Curated annotation (Swiss-Prot):
The gene is era. Disulfide bonds: none annotated. One of its GO terms (cellular component) is plasma membrane. Residues 61-64 are annotated as: G3. Coiled coil: none annotated. Gene3D superfamilies: 3.30.300.20, P-loop containing nucleotide triphosphate hydrolases (3.40.50.300). Residues 125-128 are annotated as: G4. NCBIfam families: era, PRK00089.1, small_GTP. It is a peripheral membrane protein. Belongs to the TRAFAC class TrmE-Era-EngA-EngB-Septin-like GTPase superfamily. Era GTPase family. This is GTPase Era. It is found in: Cytoplasm; Cell inner membrane. Residues 40-44 are annotated as: G2. Residues 6-173 form the Era-type G domain.
Amino acid sequence: MAEKTYSGFVAIVGKPNVGKSTLLNNLLGVKVAPISPRPQTTRKRLRGILTEGRRQIVFVDTPGLHKPMDALGEFMDQEVYEALADVNAVVWVVDLRHPPTPEDELVARALKPLVGKVPILLVGNKLDAAKYPEEAMKAYHELLPEAEPRMLSALDERQVAELKADLLALMPEGPFFYPEDYAKSDQTFGEWVAEILREEAMKRLWHEVPYAVATKVEEVAERENGVLYIKAILYVERPSQKAIVIGEGGRKIKEIGQATRKQLEALLGKKVYLDLEVKVYPDWRKDPEALRELGYRSSVG
């Protein structure tokens, strides 16, 4: 008789820039989600697959829930609500360094319909950097008293391991959604590279420019000498933004490219040749068709 298996979906939600993607990466033990100090680094749902023994979790990392200002923002919020439609548990991540904001209240309202249906874990993150974590946690818990509160740092291996064990234990009996040897993410290789490129661009650009950048991988080829050739495009909305991304004498795009290549080589364990180009796609964030062309494939518009 076959052993029982347990599996389910866990949505990771929260306002922008609270550490959702860092937590996902550390739950999986491998980098699948982009990270930068800027809000809204995550723009679309990303599935991370964790299989341990006879238990499997499909984590759904979501964009930060916020008041949308354009079609991209509407897409990002839609990604959150769709992720909550059919889950077995929710991890609501908040930042213990600060008291709740209207965006946290927005998340709490989005989770209200799930109360009593699935477990909701209120995870107070950045415990290592918070001055008054207990006070902050109490304020967050008051927004959704039915949630189960816990405090941690997404960078603390022991604390993350404890959360992972508790989540695995919550999974209902059922077949695995992905084979045991499946990759840690449902992203294609090109999507994964594009997100790393966008992460490095966001770290090095300022004001509105990082939010106007979209990235797309056009070609991946293994050369005879073993070097991995990658052709990628960075899209911006205006010629002035293109000039900023390229930089004086091409210095900025070179800096972005070098950082991306180094990260890819470290993660892949092989040499990478990164061929970058910057193009203008006017007002792509406001255009539903442009969003679909650039890989944001939900039913926006």
